[in-house]
């Protein structure tokens, strides 16, 4: 190997990979690299798991549910900390994203506007248990691909997605900016 002609960025990646600190994975244009689903660790931290995946996938920030729980203990006002009983609110997730110098924008979208968004994004769905945050990875004409903190990676038929996501005529998404 001729090190004089080797690109320095590639060289550093190669050194890190050889040292076991990174992995080199080549994905073709039709085969996106699917990163592992970050699972929720309790019944109330789906929002934290979805935020951890969104930070990783959109901003290359690696964090964990446990780290976000610890961060919330510092940043979230304990007098309004409903998350200990009911899970994290949109406002609390926005506060946590702000700690990483990112803005988490909540939007009410029609189904048509949802299909035009840039993915991944967090969606709030109601599977009948009072609400749940999940990461939407990709949308096609027939299905919605999720990295779900509870159930793992799955594809939901479009008609089922409409029932889970739409609250009358709009649904809620959270986008990292």
Name each model feature, range by range.
Residues 46:
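Active-site-proximal loop/helix segment associated with metal-binding centers of metalloenzymes
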Residues 9-19:
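Bacterial N-terminal signal peptides
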Residues 20-38, 43, 52-57, 62, ...:
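Conserved active-site-adjacent core of cysteine acyl-enzyme catalytic domains
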Residues 1-11:
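N-terminal Sec-pathway targeting helices
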Residues 3-4, 17, 41:
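Residue-level recognition of hydrophobic positions within alpha-helical transmembrane segments
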């Amino acid at each position: 190997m001729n090190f004089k002609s080797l690109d320095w960025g590639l060289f550093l990646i190669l050194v890190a990979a050889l040292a076991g600190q990174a992995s080199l994975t080549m994905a073709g244009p039709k085969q996106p690299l699917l990163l592992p689903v970050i699972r929720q660790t309790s019944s109330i931290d789906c929002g934290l798991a979805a935020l951890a995946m969104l930070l990783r996938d959109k901003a290359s920030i690696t964090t964990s549910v446990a780290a976000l729980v610890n961060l919330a203990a510092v940043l979230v006002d304990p007098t309004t900390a409903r998350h200990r009983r009911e899970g994290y609110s949109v406002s609390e997730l926005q506060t946590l994203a702000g700690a990483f110098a990112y803005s988490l924008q909540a939007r009410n979208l029609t189904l048509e506007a949802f299909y035009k968004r840039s993915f991944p994004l967090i969606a709030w769905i109601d599977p009948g248990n009072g609400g749940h945050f999940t990461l939407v990875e990709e949308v096609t004409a027939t299905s919605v691909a999720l990295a779900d903190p509870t159930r793992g990676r799955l594809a939901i038929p479009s008609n089922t997605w409409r029932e889970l996501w739409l609250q009358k005529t709009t649904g809620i998404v959270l986008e990292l900016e």
